[in-house]
Amino acid sequence: MKERVLLSWSSGKDSAWALHEIRSADEVEVVGLLTTVTEPFDRVSMHGVRRQILQAQAAAAGLPLTEVMIPSPCPNEIYEARMVSAMDVAREDGIRTVAFGDLFLEDIRAYREANLAKVSMTAIFPLWQKPTPDLAAAMVGGGLRAIIVCVDPRQLDASFAGRFYDASFLNDLPDDVDPCGE
């Protein structure tokens, strides 16, 4: 029997591709998505995606969704307490691992691993340190469909928001902008 894992779901392309990679590798079984939703806005905390879209994504993936509601602003103590509660429920269901779509940020990885260790759980990172030009090409070539919902205006013109994440989008990116938004 395969190990059962939750996938931390930001509602973005990296989470979607992490799900694809995990399913393709066929070593563990993703049994649910885990997402933080900011209470006053009723949106995914990471990307600001509406909750209805989040729920449609989970349905399209064929996976149950665990929504961890957090306030805004959310002090770390509240965030961590609510995540511990969600992990307690997951552990009761026999889940001991959470997968993340993170690519590079060592401090975020260490934070996730340390918090999971406190509740006797582990983390996996299927996209970790993959070269982003290769990863972007694999996503587009593999049929991933995504729409850019936010951009950093210090890095990229606002006109890129609302575009499909496709070969045309990647070709139009300035050379100094990471194709995965890192």
Kindly label every feature range from the protein language model.
Residues M1-E182:
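Nucleotide-activated chemistry modules centered on ATP-dependent adenylation/adenylyltransferase
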